[in-house]
Amino acid sequence: MPMSLGNAFIKNFLGKAPDWYKVAIIAFLIINPIVFFFINPFLAGWLLVVEFIFTLAMALKCYPLQPGGLLAIEAIAIGMTSPGQVKHELVANIEVLLLLVFMVAGIYFMKQLLLFIFTKILLGIRSKVLLSIAFSVTAAFLSAFLDALTVIAVIISVAVGFYSIYHKVASGQSVHSSHDHTHDEGISELTRDDLENYRAFLRSLLMHAGVGTALGGVTTMVGEPQNLIIADQAGWQFGEFLLRMAPVTVPVFIAGMLTCMLVEKFRIFGYGARLPANVRQILLDFDSEERKNRTNQDVAKLWVQGAIAVWLIVGLALHLAAVGLIGLSVIILATAFTGVIEEHSLGKAFEEALPFTALLAVFFSIVAVIIDQELFKPVIDAVLNVEDHGTQLALFYVANGLLSMVSDNVFVGTVYITEVKTALMEGMISRDQFDLLAVAINTGTNLPSVATPNGQAAFLFLLTSALAPLIRLSYGRMVIMAFPYTLALSLVGFIGIMFLLEPMTEVFYSLGWISHHVAPAADALLQSGH
């Protein structure tokens, strides 16, 4: 019997998502305007934030762009925020959007080099604990100079490469044949266990690398977008930023590495999976096959990609241009010198990042609602009104941490540093206290935010990437795997803020490594358009 038109509409709405999910989204769309107009706009704002987090948590059931986008469109339509405010948010975050469009695509054209390097690391280090630390330290080092999103894009691209090599062979095909690695039909029962173990192995490496990006990203002013904003407001240069953060970031880095060792050693929270012997053999065969078949043309491509990688790191570390523009230069150089000149070959590179770029634009419209409805204002006001300096520092760290777990850490960091700058201008706090608070804000937004994918853009990118469903990495699983790290980083960060920050900063002053800033200088900074 043919389907009625009404049923066809319902069937088409959100496609293959489960029926209960469709009902939930429709219920949200009905409830929100009622709460906004008849109960309380503030409550409606928080309801929207919770609903948006729900769509992120269900990313494996349905990509969050559609349900989240519907909620955002309705929020703008009923006046929770305005298209102007959304545009303002997008303009303010244009660097992040450019980064996603161009940098992630640029990394795609450096795949051969990345697979070459990481295959050597993966096959060279037998111990899983050492391998995990190697991934974490590499990610931390890279994200101290590059953006965390770029680093995660690199690691995702490597993991997809590893996954598809094994999947092809396990499905009974040759390594170089074209193959769809999203379907498991061709895999025999014997290799299915290996595949599950391999998925768990890749999951754990990706989570170690993801946390590594947070550990490295907090240390320097170029590590995360909000670090740049905070450094700009405080008038700090690269070296001063590094030193002022060190009393908190160094102990936290050590705690992160210890956590990495412990979860692998005791195989807890979903870690500890080893590389199955069969998979290792397939990767070894692939490596020797690649070596045998490598022509001079392939070697030339690797050299070109190596040179571009050097340009990428130098360009980003010295901030020679906006991150996205450096990404565009990578696309141009890599394609020109490796001979990729057809339009359809270029298109593939953009497939990974553009859905996420659209999702991020929706995310910024939710941020616009948070700003217009002043959802964080009660928390900020309460913290600013605390008299005791030490308590104020600790509370700033905690409040930032909690808000960064629900909202984007770039947004939280920006809101807080702006409010604190205003307090400094109005003479509510001294310049020295402002400098200490800036450290509390930076560490508070960067460290506890590893708890959930909505806190760190890099985690969100990983969760919504094409790789996540392949290795069965869901929102819930990410939260569980991040938990030991969240606990260790948040607690050690808190101890650093409470007991190490002030005495160590005084030591740095007395050694002459950093100098006291004066409030008028900050004033001049504001007037000069910062």
From Swiss-Prot:
Domain of life: Bacteria
GO cellular component: plasma membrane
Keyword Ion transport: yes
GO MF term (any one): sodium:proton antiporter activity
Localization (cell): Cell inner membrane
Membrane-spanning intervals of the chain: 23-43, 45-65, 90-110, 113-133, 140-160, 205-225, 238-258, 308-328, 351-371, 451-471, 479-499
Entry membrane topology: Multi-pass membrane protein
Swiss-Prot/TrEMBL keywords: Antiport, Cell inner membrane, Cell membrane, Ion transport, Membrane, Sodium, Sodium transport, Transmembrane, Transmembrane helix, Transport
Catalytic activity as recorded in UniProt: 2 Na(+)(in) + 3 H(+)(out) = 2 Na(+)(out) + 3 H(+)(in)
Keyword Membrane: yes
Family stated for the protein in its record: Belongs to the NhaB Na(+)/H(+) (TC 2.A.34) antiporter family.
Role description: Na(+)/H(+) antiporter that extrudes sodium in exchange for external protons.
The protein's name in its UniProt record: Na(+)/H(+) antiporter NhaB
Record organism: Vibrio cholerae serotype O1 (strain ATCC 39315 / El Tor Inaba N16961)
Top-level taxonomy: Bacteria, Pseudomonadati, Pseudomonadota, Gammaproteobacteria, Vibrionales
